[in-house]
Structure formats: C-alpha cells, structure tokens
UniProtKB/Swiss-Prot annotation:
Biological source species: Clavibacter sepedonicus
Catalytic activity: 1-(5-phospho-beta-D-ribosyl)-5'-AMP + H2O = 1-(5-phospho-beta-D-ribosyl)-5-[(5-phospho-beta-D-ribosylamino)methylideneamino]imidazole-4-carboxamide
Xref: NCBIfam families: PRK00051.1
Positions that bind Zn(2+): 93, 109, 116
Protein name listed in UniProt: Phosphoribosyl-AMP cyclohydrolase
Lineage: Bacteria, Bacillati, Actinomycetota, Actinomycetes, Micrococcales
Amino acid sequence: MSAAPLDPRGHGDPDVDGILARASFADDGLLPAVIQQHDTREVLMLGYMDREALRRTLTTGRVTFWSRSRSEYWRKGDTSGHGQYVRDAALDCDGDTVLVQVDQVGVACHTGTRTCFDADHLHPVTGARPAADEGPTP
C-alpha cells in the first residue's frame, strides 16, 4: 500500500503532508473513501473526506469523514458506539480515492446492517473469463 500504515496501537508515523500532496481532491475539495474490514476484506461503506478529514484519519487512528449534507466532520461511532479503527490506508493509482482498512466495531451502516451494500442487490448479468487459450476478446 502506498500510504504509510498505522499500527493498531496508533504508533504509525505517516508523512501526512506528503500523502496530502499526492492526494487528488475533486473540485469540491472531497476525496471518496472506501471503507473495508481489514481481515475479511468486506467493503463496508463509502464516505467522503476533505484534506482535514484525511489528515485526522491518518493521525488519530479513527476514520473521520466530511458530511456533504451537514457540512461538518463526523466519525462513525461517536453516537452509536460502532467505531471504525484504522488498520491501514492507501491512495489508489490516480490518488483520487482512498482505501481505508478498519477494524469495525458493530455495524457500519446507519440502517443497522453490517455494510451499506446489503440492501439493494442489482442482479447484473454476470460475465465469464475467457478460457486461457482464447485470448482477449477484440
């Protein structure tokens, strides 16, 4: 992972200014943050971070988001007790999305489900990988 990892006891030493310089925030100043359970790799939720929320996430060991609807910082679990504790973080190849691996306490979704992706399965047509001898499809 490209970001310096934080150890579970909060002893990470990330180059936060360097990470913020590499991050590519959108015109609205936000960066999508994919939140994933560190041990199962289950995707829990998607939130948004501005520079300060990313800084707080990398330096405190707790995930901090920017609320687009309330225009304020928030941390999962501050009211519910269902906290997200940072285990690792990485920017994607373009620097325009951050993956934060967490130790999730309780449920991640405000609806009371484990993830925010439990309710609305879209049932897409599934694809199949071509056989090894077929090569790529033109």
